[in-house]
Amino acid sequence: GFGVSACATCDGFFFKEKVVAVVGGGNAAVEEAMFLTKFASKVKLIHRRDTLRAEKLLQKKLMENKKIEIIWDSAVEEVIGDSEPKNVKAIKIKNLKTNKIEEMKIDGLFIAIGHDPATALFKEQLEMDKEGYLLTKPDSTETNIPGVYAAGDVKDKTFRQAVTAAGMGCMAALEAEKFLSH
């Protein structure tokens, strides 16, 4: 809140004609940055390396977008804001090659440095993809173990929204009720 977010879809519209920064270099960061150009006057993508990890097609679209500036080899050191009203007014970024720290005026900061599902507990018990997300049967929330269901951020690597998690939770509850009644 108060100008720091992990969800451009949720909070992007608060930054109409403002300057925002996105931290990250993968698909999520590039997609967030491109989405934010619908609202923000300028989007600064801050990445700690000198190359992006995002898919090549996404990188091409990003590079073609005139509203996006990429700040390479850098990391956010500090978020600077006001207390009344609470909001972001700048960040301090450190160039990881030169160690030089600069202050950059922004109105919002979006964190998109990856999402790891909290599934380590289920390793070697439930089937997972290579990123650790639980796998379910097609059009279902049922896992490889009958009576065990997956919903929300442990299964959904695309949207990661409360509303989609709630919908999946409802599906899982209905499937569990059906399983228990048979």
Segment roles from a protein language model:
Residues K16, E32-A33, E55, A120-F122, ...:
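Short glycine-/acidic-enriched loop or helix-start segments at secondary-structure transitions
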Residues K38-P138, I145, K178-H182:
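A Rossmann-like FAD-binding core segment of flavoenzymes
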Residues V30-M34, I145, A151-H182:
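A conserved FAD-binding loop/helix module that cradles the flavin
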Residues T9, G25, R48-D50, D153:
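Cofactor-binding loop segments of dinucleotide-utilizing enzymes, especially the Rossmann-like FAD-
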Residues V23, A112-I113, N144, A151:
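Short, well-ordered coil/turn residues at beta-beta hairpins
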